[in-house]
From Swiss-Prot:
Outcome, altering residue 18 to R: Less stable tetramers; decreased ability to bind DNA
Protein family (similarity comment): Belongs to the histone-like Alba family.
Protein name according to UniProt: DNA/RNA-binding protein Alba 2
Function as written in the Swiss-Prot or TrEMBL entry: Binds double-stranded DNA tightly but without sequence specificity. Involved in DNA compaction.
Length: 89
């Protein structure tokens, strides 16, 4: 399952939708959409576009939310929210 992961960043939403659809069409039973920080809303958009517009049979199997603690080069620590959305056929 580790190879069926889409990491969402700052690119346009449709790039990640296409990556997710490609994974599902190549035989993956599940695809994990992962994002951190400000990209979380984009990850939710990706999951909803895949489900509603392209593949209505796909369901949200699981959603995990968490917080990662990052340390900057100056030694300052900051918390960053993360999300994992598991889509399954």
């Amino acid at each position: 399952m580790a190879e069926h992961v889409v990491y969402v960043g700052n690119k346009p939403v449709m790039n990640y939708v296409l990556a997710t659809l490609t994974q599902l069409n190549e035989g993956a039973d599940e695809v994990v959409i992962k994002a951190r920080g400000r990209a979380i809303s984009r990850a939710v958009d990706v999951a909803e576009i895949v489900r509603n517009r392209f593949m209505p049979g796909v369901k949200v199997k699981e959603i995990k939310i968490d917080t990662e603690e990052l340390e900057s080069e100056q030694g300052r620590r900051s918390n960053v929210s993360t999300i994992e959305i598991v889509l399954a056929k």
